[in-house]
């Protein structure tokens, strides 16, 4: 009981620190401007990208164009993530999802699953486009990022509640031990990793770049590995 509690405390503290770092990064980079709720009318709104249509963490109305102060709402490179058409039906969200999609001025997606869901629900053959992370590329940032001062390491990039299966963990540990690598998790907390490190979104790229290899089960983990030519 105490061990379980201490793990939860460490994870909670890690996520508190993570929020502080991300909030500071947003301010420094000028990412967050005025909130849309301050406006009564806007010429257009662009939603996306990433898992804006995913329902596994609960539906967010504004991601579907609801309650936005504009008649022109576009979705770029949206994604349903792990959500399937069966999930939508099981959660009784079919009318919610269909209504949001039909009211969008135009939309595009980044993957086949999302394309197929939309085609089935509203009959649109939407375009599959590149995720902005791939389009941007971070070429300038990668040239100026300092090298990670760290023993040779295997990088794990998975959400907190993922990649904790005993068989998976044992296989990753065995692979790392055989190659003399530490196991490092930047951005998410896994108590079985040797190190859990909090970094801002750009510094995160340097951890991918300097890793001996990467183990990930996420879209952006794969994309960042491709951008820096990391071994997957």
Predicted features and spans:
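Catalytic donor nucleotide-activated moiety binding site of glycosyltransferases and closely related
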Residues: 75-82, 115-118, 158-201
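Structural loop-to-beta junction motif characteristic of Rossmann-like glycosyltransferase folds
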Residues: 229-232
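Donor nucleotide-activated moiety binding/catalytic core segment of transferases
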Residues: 126-134, 138, 188-223
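A conserved, positively charged/aromatic
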Residues: 98-102, 208
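A short beta-strand/loop micro-motif in the catalytic core of glycosyltransferases
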Residues: 104-111, 215
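Conserved donor-binding/catalytic core segment of Leloir-type glycosyltransferases
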Residues: 147-160
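An anion/phosphate-binding loop that grips the pyrophosphate of nucleotide cofactors and donors
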Residues: 42, 104, 211
